[in-house]
Each structure stands twice: as structure tokens, then as C-alpha cells.
Amino acid sequence: MESEMLQSPLMGLGEEDEADLTDWNLPLAFMKKRHCEKIEGSKSLAQSWRMKDRMKTVSVALVLCLNVGVDPPDVVKTTPCARLECWIDPLSMGPQKALETIGANLQKQYENWQPRARYKQSLDPTVDEVKKLCTSLRRNAKEERVLFHYNGHGVPRPTVNGEVWVFNKNYTQYIPLSIYDLQTWMGSPSIFVYDCSNAGLIVKSFKQFALQREQELEVAAINPNHPLAQMPLPPSMKNCIQLAACEAHELLPMIPDLPADLFTSCLTTPIKIALRWFCMQKCVSLVPGVTLDLIEKIPGRLNDRRTPLGELNWIFTAITDTIAWNVLPRDLFQKLFRQDLLVASLFRNFLLAERIMRSYNCTPVSSPRLPPTYMHAMWQAWDLAVDICLSQLPTIIEEGTAFRHSPFFAEQLTAFQVWLTMGVENRSPPEQLPIVLQVLLSQVHRLRALDLLGRFLDLGPWAVSLALSVGIFPYVLKLLQSSARELRPLLVFIWAKILAVDSSCQADLVKDNGHKYFLSVLADPYMPAEHRTMTAFILAVIVNSYTTGQEACLQGNLIAICLEQLSDPHPLLRQWVAICLGRIWQNFDSARWCGVRDSAHEKLYSLLSDPIPEVRCAAVFALGTFVGNSAERTDHSTTIDHNVAMMLAQLINDGSPMVRKELVVALSHLVVQYESNFCTVALQFMEEEKNYPLPSPAATEGGSLTPVRDSPCTPRLRSVSSYGNIRAVTTARNLNKSLQNLSLTEESGSSVAFSPGNLSTSSSASSTLGSPENEEYILSFETIDKMRRVSSYSALNSLIGVSFNSVYTQIWRVLLHLAADPYPDVSDLAMKVLNSIAYKATVNARPQRILDTSSLTQSAPASPTNKGMHMHQVGGSPPASSTSSCSLTNDVAKQTVSRDLPSSRPGTAGPTGAQYTPHSHQFPRTRKMFDKGPDQTTDDADDAAGHKSFICASMQTGFCDWSARYFAQAVMKIPEEHDLESQIRKEREWRFLRNTRVRKQAQQVIQKGITRLDDQIFLNRNPGVPSVVKFHPFTPCIAVADKDSICFWDWEKGEKLDYFHNGNPRYTRVTAMEYLNGQDCSLLLTATDDGAIRVWKNFADLEKNPEMVTAWQGLSDMLPTTRGAGMVVDWEQETGLLMSSGDVRIVRIWDTDRETKVQDIPTGADSCVTSLSCDSHRSLIVAGLGDGSIRVYDRRMALSECRVMTYREHTAWVVKAYLQKHPEGHIVSVSVNGDVRFFDPRMPESVNVMQIVKGLTALDIHPQANLIACGSMNQFTAIYNGNGELINNIKYYDGFMGQRVGAISCLAFHPHWPHLAVGSNDYYISVYSVEKRVR
């Protein structure tokens, strides 16, 4: 019968596939993004897309040197020859009229691209006329761009000396015009177009002269006495652009079917010349009936996209833009295609000129030079579009049939869609992105284009950056003017992506009234919650630290809109609505008072108990900024601040460190507002701390909690350098053996053997005491911790009176508590706040200076961290606590300390003579009382002035910026853990297969029967006395806790894997450990007897350092005891619930998913809880108590009825109470007297009893095998089967010449294998198993 009671199946996982399925279905604890990521924002995007020097071409000089009817002497023209200039035959009319008509036509052609520019023609000019024209245009243009168009078809070719030709007044001579002079007149920025043979020569000469100018400028700058420095400085030509029709050695084509100014035609009438050139190609024969005359009759206008001609122009723009974006470097693309509308048009058309003119062995030249584009694949798409258009012309013109629109844009969007569906890893960006931009304003393609654009932006910040660089911003900004409801979700998504990467767009939105669009979306109850969430984020960005945005959104009724959605079931929406509220009234008093009128703060209170930690954190942020306004105070506002503060104070023991960090920041706002009040409270507290003795620890006798006197063995509080600065993380994987025997000298001069407690954690900790700006704390951790513990005793209240219970007093208590928080980031922030007030209070005390001192206080610096010399100090090892309580004049001089070894502290130092000492150097680091400080002559007002700014500047959590990262990341992509082909998924599969193998093999060994368990398979000396030991369920790793550190051993290889400090204070000890997510990504939970819980990752990892995932105060008001249960826990992986109890009167249940307390079940006893065991299937909790009782609770029932059974058969301390996991599991309990009792939870009495050895110190029950192991103070371990029969004793270590084992301090069975780990007071840890032949 007993055997049946102890024997349990594989926790209901008898079949391999069932067990494997359970692994997949088990929830993972502390694996959310808030646990895996650092709480900080993304790195800000360099705004390369936003043009800082956007320009306009405001003036255009059209210089035509045609001399109609007279050919220049150095050009021999063919017969027939190209004659058309600006599509005018100059011989069809008189020379003068022809010249004027050509000039007028050229101006019209340019006006199509820039109608607002100022145009000036200079027809067959002289040098003076050109000079006058250029200087006039430059003078009027100021800093804007001027265009100089030069047609030199009627004059000789440019010279190698850098000259072009114009005329004399009588047209009897060609006069040279130096490019150097032209540069001087035109200035910069300018763009030059040269349409003449050998035009490349001009470009070369231009560059040479520009370089010469730069050298002259440099000489004048270096030597003011140089003759060049006395002359007017020449303008720099750096910002000049040139377009030339051909290379330096080339002539313009003279084919009669082409215009003579082919280059100009390409630049100014691209569609006309492109169609004409297309008709001259052989491929046009495939389209019958198309002639040069027919293409002149293409219906429509260039600027009307609905017509054939307009559609062709639109397609041409899209294609040339796309070619440029795909070929040009990004910065060059921005400069040439996005900076200036006219320049962009000319360069798009220049790509056509290159394609057409290269077919006639003529190569257009540009400066800056472009990569070749004439062979780009997109030209084929252009040819197809032209082909489709021209093929319709005969029927359209002759028969009047309707025009069929080109499928070009639809096909390009499909190509873009294909690129998106094929994956983006290691691929170049989609070349169709500029085309998507082109169709955003087209009603036909807009919806599809926005959808595809959104999917592209969802790929990540790089995609957003790419889209912004291509010029998407003005288009999506303009679309906010649309009232189409179907666009709302798409636009909201796109804008959320943009603002998540570049928040500076907030100003553009407000300027264009874009915020009104999002206000209407957020107020729309028919919008899905996901899109309202994005809208709330967008508005939160608009009002973030931007007064104009705050004012605009306040007028738009944002506060009321947000308040209506605080109770929305969508948690992300609740989170961002709260953040949005917090930002709109941050440093904006009008919004705060609007919030007061709407009772916003009271409506936010409900979110403080939200099940989602991020929502609670957002609510704390919003309430923190609500009380953080620096406007003038009234009684009403003060009352509101007090109410908010007291509501926030309830989160002091929230399970999420993220929430508690935000709580510190919120309370710091209150501290800044009511600084003088807090200074008074601080002085009051410190005075009481000095006079009031700390209550003594309690001792447990017979399982009851009773106070005892303080004794010399009571652990001292640790020094300031060890707490609140847990930052040092070493790179060494193992503890250096040379440090094992290293002696460190304490202040008393005694030598102590190395232990984790002798190492300081942070070389950045305070070495002297001064202003908070240097992180040099006036209040040590010891002082703060004592203040916290003293203030928790009600007797103190009567000493100080009613004022002690004021709001400021309560908030000070909260900050004291948070300064001792187990999570270092929280305690660091709280220490900063407390010390800021302490610093301010000492400055206000106006001390007098000390003159006659033989030695001055300068505390020894914190022990430096040597990365290669000691164990991981992730949690921070406390150094030997200081015993000094020096007076202000009995001090030691600062000693130079080696960086290689922890510092030693001499007790005395030579006198330094009377001198002035900095204020911050005259305080003992660990002084007992909050003193007003030594006197000094320097004025502290300057230091005090920066006090508020210190708190405000340093009080940042990064929560809001971190939350915004969600919108910058892919939300449409399948999470990697759900992707069947991902690395993470494969690793999980491997782990679950391993788990199945371990379960199967272990069960096979157990089924063979266990007759002995004394084969020692592992033995090693632990760095500290083992207090808790825990097997990993599936890897050969065992965790061994000593008082304040954790060591990991590989029990198969016999190697030490890791050793790090847990971070708990010196006067506390680790009393429990649990592996979380043991089946997958394992974490280690540690519990200490001060009620703190810490969770670690990356332990026993050769590539990473241990890292604290989270920490919180699992139990508050734990009574300090010299002998007690400490903290006991039990973990339910299936539900993610953590049961905790110990030296308290309750069993507290934590939901690790929500990181919040679920319930407190009263134990109904006056003694401590010594053991906990739970069963998720029946919701039962079994507690063993120090008074010998076993109590069963059903957590589904009301608190007054949940204790369903109490067994009082044990008469002494219960060592173990175990609830078997299978559905009909029994309760097995053992007391220190060795009586093992079996209970059926349905029965009022035990169903069986057996007696084992007395004087137990540790006991465990194997969850699978029929085994009980117990350890004794009498230096042996006994193993029993379920019938109470002794299997074997273990009294001696193997291979130690019969050395006797020490007193057993802890032991534990492996969850699956028949392995037993035993820790003893002689520092040794050993693992025993069945005989080798059985294994």
C-alpha cells in the first residue's frame, strides 16, 4: 500500500508522444520581450532622407548663338542635314524671326518644367550682354539656383583653352567668352546646359577653373598678406551642375530625321523625341500604320494622366526615376532627383538623352558624372508601354475607339508584390519602389499601392529609411487630406511605421494639420483596436516633447478621446492611450488642468492593477508626468498630487521591475515639486535612525516566531559600494583558483579567507561622498536600509507624531523600500532620488569649515573589479562591511589603490596638515547619522542649482521609447519561434527530443528496480557551504546555492561551469531555488529569506555571462530570524504560478505571466511555513509548518474557506510536505523526528506512518521512483524505499581514505534519473546513483 502511495507515474506523461506534446504546450515564464530586451529605444535614424538644403531654380538664362543662315567655319554639315531647333525649321522664315521664334519656343519648353522661374533670353549676344544677363540673374536669385542654357550651333566649337564663342555687335566676328568669366558672373549654385559639338571640353575646362578657384580661396585663407587675399574672393563652384550634349571629341549627330538640337529636345520635350526615335527603330515595323505624322496626333495633354499622352509622360517619369534610384548612389540621387524640381526633371530627361544619343555614337556628359543607364532593363518596360500606346493609335484616330490604359503600373505593382512574397534576406531592395511612390496619388492604384507600401515598411527600419529616401514622405502627407475611409487603416499603419523610425516628422504633421486626421481615427469606434492603437502611438509621438503638437492635440480634444478608451479590452491600446495622456500633459499645465477637469488621474487608477505589466507601467508614467508639472502650485493641485502619490505608492511591491522603475521616476517628479518638504522628512528620519535601535532578529523555537536579543553573530549590513551599483560583470568563466586562498585585509586588520562577500561589486561606486552628479552618495545603503527597517516599526510613529504619517513621510518610506529593491536598476534610481534630497538638505544646512584637523575624511574607494581575476559578479558581491563610525575629524587619508587586486584599508594614515578639503570629501562613507556636514567656505549654491536638473536628467527608464520599438519591428511576419524552418524552432525541437530521451532512459532504469543508491558519480568542493541544491531536469547540470552565491557543476564531467553572486544583502541567505522553463529555455529562480526573488538566465553558458532577468519582493514583512524556514517556494510550470511562503502568516501566489500577486492565502497558524507543494490539476496547495501541522488549501475557494484540511499528527518541525502529482496523489510529509506520514486529502487522518532516522536536516522524495532520502546532522545520508525499508546509508566519501561526510546541509533527487545530490557543511557536494550495471 505504501509502495502505491509513493509510486507515481510520469506526472501523467506516460507515453513518449504525450510527454513531447506537453513540452510544446507548456507556457514559458519570463520570456516576453520585456525580459529578453534591454528597456531602451531604438537608435535614432540619421535623417539622410530629409533634404537640408532644398533649392529652387528661380532664374533661367537662355543664350542662343545660332546666326541663322550662316554656318560656322569649323563645321562641315551633311546634305541633307538636321535643321530643326526647338522643333522650328529656321530656314522656313526670316533669320531674325526664326531666332526669336526659336527663343520663345525654348522658353515655353522650359516653362513646362518650371513655370514660376524668371526667364531671360539672349539671342546671338555679345560678351557684355552675357555678362549683364548673368550678373543680373545672380543678383536677383541670391542663394537660389540659376540655369544657364547655351546653344552654340551657329558659332565655332569650344576651345581647349576653356572658351565658348559669342558675337561682336555687328556680327562680323566670333568673340571668345572665357568659362572662367562665366563662372564669376553666374556664381553658385548654378546649372549649365551646353548644346554644341565638343561640349565635353567645356565641362573639363569648367572643372579646371573651379579647382583653380578653390586653390585661390585656400591661399587667401592661409595667408592674409598674399596678393590674392587683397582681391575680391572668387565664388566657389562646388555646388554647380553641368549637362553637355557630347564628349570633348564628339560632334553632334546630323541625321535629317532628327532635330539639330537633339540634346535640348531630350531635355525639354522628352516624350515627343522619344516617340519620334521609337518610330525610327526597326521594331516599329511590328506595329503597322504608325508614322511620324501619326505620333503628332496622339490625343491628350502631358499633364493629364487620364489621356494617352499624359499616361505616357507619367510612365516615363516613373521609369526614369526608378532607373536613377536603382543606379545612382543614394546621396547623389537625393541631390539630383529630390533637391530641385527643375534639376530633377532635367536629369530624368538626361537619362533619355543618353539612351537616344548613344545610338548615334554620341555620349552626353554630366557633372557630377552618372553611371551608365542606357542599357537598364526598365527601358524595355518603356518600349513596351510605347508599343501598346502606338498600336492603338490607328483605331483611336480613324475609328474613334476608346483608349485602353497601359497595364504598366499594375504589372510593376505585381512585380513589387512578388518581391515581398519571396523573402528579403540578403537581397537588394525592390527596384519598383519609386513606381509605388508614383501611383500613391492615383485613385486607380492607390489602395493596392498603400497596401504594398505598408507591407514593405513592415520589414523594418531599413525599409522605412529606404522609402523615405526615395521621397515617399510628401505623398503620404498629402494623402491625409483624403476623406476615404478605406484608406484609414493603411495610412495609419504607414504613419506608425514612419514615426517609429523618425519621430521628427511630428512637426510636419502638425504644420499640415495631419494630427486632425489621426484624432478622428482614434475617436472612430468602428476602427479596429489594432489601428486605434497605432493611432494612439502616432498621437503620442506628435505630442512628445513638442509644445506645438501638445497645444494642437489639446484643442482637438485628445484627452477626452483617450480617456474613453482606457478600458478597452485590447491591452496595447490601453498602454498607448495612457502613454499618450502622459505625454500630452508633460510640462504642459493647460493639458494637466484639462485632465483634472475630466478626472483623468482617477480614471487612470484602474490601470494600476491591470493584468498586463506594460499597461501598469504606462499608467504609472502618465500619473508621474501628471504630478510632474512645474507650474505654480495651489491647494487644489497639491491635494491632487498627494492623492496620486498615495495611489502610486501601492505599487511598491509590484512584480515587474519595469513598473517599479517607472514608479521611482514618477515619485521623483513629486520629490522635485515638493523638495523642501522632503528635505524636512529626510532630516527627521535620519535623526530617528540615529537615536532608535534597530529591532533584533527573531528566533524560532518550536516553530513559533519570537523576538530575541541582538547578538554578536547577527550579520552586519553591507557597505554602500556593494548595493545599488550591481553592475560589474566579469568575462572570466570560472573562479580563478589562485583567489581561492587569497587573504583580504579588513579595516580591523584581520585577515579573512576569500569568499564572495569579500569582493566589491563596482569600481564605479562611490569612493567619496558628494554631489549626486558624480554618483557619489551621501546616504550609504546601510543608512538607507536601517532607515527603511526602523520606519517599518509602529513604535516609531508615536515618537514623531502625526506628521510622520504625512504623504511626504509615506512616499519617503516607499523610496527607502525601493532603494533596497532586489532589482539593481530600481534600487539605483531610488538611491539617486534619496541622495539628491540628502545633498540638497546638506547644502541648505550652510555648514562652517573645519581648520584644525590632523587628518581628513576620505573613504577608501570601492574595490576595483578585475575582469580576469574572479567569479561572475552579476549580482554584486558585498565587500566586508565597514565597522567605522568615525567622527568628522577622526578620519583617514585617501590611499592609492592598485587596480589589480581588491583594495586593502589601513586603519591609520599620516597627517596631511591643516587645509581646506572639498565638501564631498569630509563625510565618512558609511556614517551612521544624517549630518549637516562639515563647514566650508565655498558657496554651494551653484551645486544646488543643478539639483532639480540632476533628478530630471537622470530619471529616465526608456520605457516609452522601448514600447515604440514594437511599431518599428515587423508585425506581419510570422514570429521566428512559430516559423517551422527557423533556427529557434529547430533548437526547440532538439531540446524536446532530448527531454523525451531523458524521460525514457530514466524510466527504464527505475523500472529495473533500485536496490542501492550509493555509487558516487560526482564529488567536488563547492566554493561555499551548500544550502540548496537543485538538479536541472534534462541537462547534466546541478545548481548549488550557498549563502549568497550560486555555483553550477556538470555532474557528468565533474567540471565547474559557473559561479556568480546572487545579489542578496549580507544579512540574508538563499533558501530556495527552482528551474523555470526546464523543458526549454531554462531560467533559475532564487529566493532569499528577506522575501526577495531573483530570476537568472545565461547561467552555465560558456559564451554569455549570467544576467538577471527579473527580481521582485515575493514576500514583504519577512521577520528576520536566526533560525527559520526563510522563504520556501513551489513552481507550477503548467500554469505559470509561483507559490511562496516562509517566515510569514500567508501563502502568496504570484502569476508570473502577469507579474502580479494573485492571492494571499492566510495560513491560520502562528508558525512559519517550512515546505510547500502544489498540484495544478486539483488547485491544491499543501503546506508543512514549523509547529508540525500539515495544512491543505484549495485556492479556488474564498479566503475564509480555502483551508480544507489540517493534519496535526507531527509534533515537530515539518522538513518536507510533498503532494504527489498524479490525479490520485497522496500527501507525504516528514518531520525532524523522522516520522513519515501518508495522507489522503479526502481523509481526516493519515493512512499510513513509518519511522526513519531522527534528527533530520534535509529530506527529499523522488517524484518518479519509490525513494526517500534524508540527511542528518550526524554526518550521514539514508535512503529508504516506499515501504520504509532502509536501502543504504552513505557515511563516507569514495576515494578519500574513508573520510567521513560532513553534516548534511541539503539534498535533492533528480526529477527523472535515480540520482541524489547531497551537500554538506564541509563544503562538499556529491551525487550518488544506482550501480553502474543498472545504469
Swiss-Prot record:
Record field: compositional bias (Low complexity): 755-771, 877-887
Superkingdom of the organism of origin: Eukaryota
Main function: Component of the mechanistic target of rapamycin complex 1 (mTORC1), an evolutionarily conserved central nutrient sensor that stimulates anabolic reactions and macromolecule biosynthesis to promote cellular biomass generation and growth. In response to nutrients, growth factors or amino acids, mTORC1 is recruited to the lysosome membrane and promotes protein, lipid and nucleotide synthesis by phosphorylating several substrates, such as ribosomal protein S6 kinase (RPS6KB1 and RPS6KB2) and EIF4EBP1 (4E-BP1).
This protein's name: Regulatory-associated protein of mTOR
First-listed, main subcellular location of the protein, grouped into a coarse class: cytoplasm
Modified residues (Phosphoserine): 44, 122, 696, 719, 721-722, 738, 791-792, 836, 855, 859, 863, 877, 982
Family, per entry: Belongs to the WD repeat RAPTOR family.
Modified residue annotations for Phosphothreonine: 706, 865
